[in-house]
Amino acid sequence: VGIGEAPVRDADHLSDYPFDTTTINELVDAEAAGDICGNFFTITGELCDTTLKNRIISIDIRDLPEHKRVIGVGGGEKKVRSILGALNGHYLHALITDVQTAEKVLELADNNTL
């Protein structure tokens, strides 16, 4: 599964998500760190309670651990918080990323700077 980065509320940054400003603001206010299959979660792995969850047709990522093998894919500086959230939520069995991103995820987890 792909691990999406956190939505941002920034006029200078175009969102990777096709959502209106109200939805982006709701996700930012809910402290969304990233998403898997349209399910947004915090850096601690908790699902974000937003109105968006009622408007997306997708697998419920809480069901992912029941599958034999769930492999997450993500890399780069912008994905560090989202990868850590996915790992904290126990949504993945394995992760494919680059060394630099893996080191930053471990550093963030070790520093308890959640």
Question: Model-derived features: where do they sit?
Answer:
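Conserved phosphate- and dinucleotide-binding cores of soluble alpha/beta proteins
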Residues: V1-L114
